UniProtKB/Swiss-Prot annotation:
Gene for this chain: lipA
Full protein name: Lipoyl synthase
Listed Gene3D superfamilies: Aldolase class I (3.20.20.70)
Cofactor: [4Fe-4S] cluster
GO cellular component: cytoplasm
Organism: Granulibacter bethesdensis (strain ATCC BAA-1260 / CGDNIH1)
Compositionally biased intervals (Basic and acidic residues): 1-29
Amino acid sequence: MVTRVLIDHRQGGRHEAGVRHPEKQHRPDNPSQPKPSWIRVKAPNHPVYHQTQALMRENRLTTVCEEAACPNIGECWSQRHATMMIMGDTCTRACSFCNVKTGLPHALDGDEPARVADAVARLGLRHVVITSVDRDDLNDGGAAHIAAVIKAVRLAAPETTIEVLTPDFLRKPGAAETVAEARPDVFNHNLETVPRLYPAIRPGARYFQSLRLLDQVKRLDPSIFTKSGLMVGLGEDRAEIAQVMDDLRIAEVDFITLGQYLQPTPKHAAVDRFVTPDEFSDYASMARSKGFLMVSSSPLTRSSYHADADFAALRAARMEQQQRIA
């Protein structure tokens, strides 16, 4: 993954760092640290990668894999796993960790649910992850559109399980109910970091609003798996991670992911340190001890990384838990 010049997978060209983030241009550059050996990934060059890319273009779909410059894009797309990002490619927030473009979004595309559903069916996905930009400009934060996508995928690919990774719907009453009523198999909302770092890393969000959202969805429909993720390496400490895990368990969140923060450009938040694989293993043990049904913790873990296999394991873990209780 490069820092000063980013590969634009959508156009096959390049763009200078910062063009996507005009609100960050007044900031001084943050130095980029050399990545350790356990972070390095191969450049995407598999035939199936290009087939997946072509299908995304044909259906005019945006993916978070590209927009967020995910390091796992080569591996995932080579297995026909792509996380579709709905409601446009422009976010109304300006988080200091995120590579998604910031600005004034276009109106929602009413044909998008059908195009997403078509792509899911043609890829033959057993499990699909659908995420979105924040849409603070919409009265419901885009909740009805997310629900429409879920319903369209159910019709086109009834055997496919659906995971949604949503915004926080800050000050959008009724949004959680709208999404929960569409009954995704997994409702994911990432806390991203520890509460102390929110003003610097996630300034447009509120930690306890994100927790309330996860708790609310679980209360609305306990059959929906809930999931949340954290980036580490931003300056948090072990005790803070433990507290976030406790908060998530109080909200009855089933699945936690932990991965290394990687700096997209010099204008984004700097990496405080690279967390070692052994530390990720320690975090995984800690999370399991606190009662999470499923834990994914590694340097390259992202919300949708290995989501298909993880969902199967998550469902099996719930069945085992229910059998023990019975």
